[in-house]
Structures are given as C-alpha cells and as structure tokens.
Regions:
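Catalytic pocket-lining loop regions of alpha/beta-barrel enzymes
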Residues: 69-178
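Short, electropositive alpha-helical surface patch
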Residues: 11-29, 162-170, 195-202
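Glycine-rich, proline-tolerant flexible connector loops at the mouths of alpha/beta enzymes
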Residues: 1-10
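Short, glycine/acidic-enriched loop or turn micro-motifs at the edges of active sites
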Residues: 39, 116, 185
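Mid-to-C-terminal alpha-helical segments outside catalytic/metal-binding sites
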Residues: 167, 171-178, 187-226
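Active-site gating/metal-coordination segments in enzymes
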Residues: 9-94, 100, 145-150
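Conserved, mostly hydrophobic/aromatic
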Residues: 18, 31, 79, 113, ...
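A generic "structured core" feature
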Residues: 71, 75, 84, 107-110, ...
C-alpha cells in the first residue's frame, strides 16, 4: 500500500509510475494519490480521472498545513462521485475544522497519522483529543490510521505510543482503526520490526479478532486489497 509523496507538481506522474511498477512486480497492491487544491476544479477532476486509469487507485490525500489540507466541497463531491476515499492529514488544531468540513459526506475518510500530533505537550494532547472526538463522531465511514507517531514523539517505545493509540481506539473502536507505518520517515527512530513490535505490545490485551482487524482486516476491506 503506497500513499502519495510530497511532490505537488508530479502527483499524476507518481501514480503513473507506481501503476507501471505494480504491473511489473505486483506491488503496491493499492495506492492513494494526491491533488493540488490550488488547481481549479476542472483540472482536479482531470487529474482524478487520469489516476483512475489504474485499477489500484483508491483515493487521494492533500499535503499542506491547516485549511490548505481540508478538502473543499467540490473536491469531496468529485471523490464521492468516483467512489474514491479521502485521506485527511492535518495537525490537531485543524482536526475540528476538518470534521466540520467533512460532516454529511458519505465517502470513506481516513484520518492519517493518528491525527498527526506535533509533540507530547499537554496542550497539543487536549487539542488532539477534542478534534479526534469530533471526527470519530461523524459516521461509520471515518477510519483512523494508527501511524505517524514515531517522528513527533522521537521514539518507537510502546509506552510512548500507548496513550495516543489507546485513546484513538476508544474513540473509533477496533472496527475503525488500522495500523500503518510512515516509512521511510519512521526509519529515523527505529526499524520496521521495532515499530510493529511496539504496536503489538500496545494492543497485546485485545482479543485475536480485534488485533486481526487492526493489523490487517480493516485495511484490506477499506483499500480493497483482494
């Protein structure tokens, strides 16, 4: 599973290259592309349609800060009309505004990087808790991707991850959460095995079915990894 890199002028090229790679190697099994929200809607729709020419394309995320990364109604309509998902990547101070913008839409939404906190600061944590509660309360089609914690926490320790992951699962439930990595960025703080060992430690108290949902089943369903 591949999610778009931060290359706003090469987003369609990236999807095209990944489609060729998948044809040759079988991987990635699915991909999330990107859009530049500064483009007019007709151009955005053209870019979506071009990326849809690969059967592995599942949706888009927008890279940016604050309101820039919150999709407009036009973008959401274009995605919904095409059966695509939207991956939300904003910091805690933009989670509540994002929830307001997403209210009422039926397309699948993925909250990336566990709501993307910037630090373990108590004020950041409170902003995060409030915004995540707003997003979790929208609808059953909003999922939390449990990822992206190693960089802001500068650690892959299970004890560091636990408060964030436990609260996200409390809000969204194990039916609407899934583990993911943020490699290669996560690699500054440990290995892939370190990351998933920490995840496994954090949820060791859950039953087998719940862990299966977090580590595989939910992602397979959402991204249609069949």
């Amino acid at each position: 599973m591949h999610v778009a890199a931060a290359a706003p002028d090469k987003l369609v090229d990236e999807t095209r290259e990944l489609a060729a790679q998948a044809h040759a190697t079988g991987h990635p099994d699915a991909l999330v592309g990107g859009l530049d929200p500064n483009e007019d809607l007709a151009e955005l729709e053209r870019q979506l349609d071009e990326q849809l020419t690969t059967k592995r394309f599942r949706g888009i995320r927008i890279m940016g800060e604050g309101d820039h990364a919150i999709p407009t109604p036009g973008i959401l309509q274009a995605l919904q009309d095409r059966g695509l998902l939207f991956e939300l990547m904003v910091h805690p101070d933009a989670l509540a505004p994002a929830a307001a913008a997403l209210a009422g839409w039926e397309l699948p939404v993925v909250v990336e990087h566990t709501g993307w906190p910037r630090s373990n600061d108590p004020e950041e944590h409170e902003l995060w808790r409030a915004g995540m509660a707003d997003l979790a309360g929208l609808r059953a089609n909003v999922t939390c991707k449990l990822s992206g914690l190693a960089m802001p926490m500068q650690s892959m320790a299970a004890a560091t991850f636990a408060p964030w992951i436990h609260h996200a699962i409390e809000l969204f439930g194990t039916d609407r959460c899934m583990f993911a990595s943020n490699f290669p960025v996560d690699g500054m703080h440990g290995s892939f095995d370190d990351l998933y060992t920490a995840y496994a430690t954090v949820v060791a108290g859950l039953d087998d079915d719940a862990r299966a949902r977090l580590f595989a089943d939910n992602a397979e369903r959402l991204y249609r990894l069949d």
